């Protein structure tokens, strides 16, 4: 489905091809149409509804934290990591979203998974880029249990790519594609 949505938004396929692809992937007609309707405003040439846009002030971290709060989340599970500083700074100004510190990325995903199962709410977590491989086993567990998780990872600035080659992944999405 991710590839179909990407192809639709990139104007590589038509609406008809998108719906046919969704049907081939065993989605019902109603589910395929619902998916199309949710991404239609992002197709080049489409008009964006006013309720899809808003003005924001602050940093990108503030925007991310505010978006998480708008989902009704109360907790953001975090692990140690250098790229998380701006988000943690933003949490100081947004006390309605409480950070829960995990000591390892794998534990972070397991804790967010357990929280989601116990509360019935989506678990949100964020970890540093080197933690992505460490977190993948528990991402697999959450995927198998169909637990709703939203996980964020920082990434190196493009001008710094390759300076810590032992920590860089060539394709971030490819590493976790089976679980998302």
Q: How should these model regions be labeled?
A:
Residues 5, 14, 22-28:
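Extreme N-terminal leader/targeting regions
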Residues 20-27, 38-180:
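N-terminal alpha/beta PP-like core and its mobile active-site loop of ThDP/TPP-dependent enzymes
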Residues 3-4, 31, 175:
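Exposed alpha-helical structural elements
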Residues 1-13, 39-41:
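N-terminal secretory signal peptides
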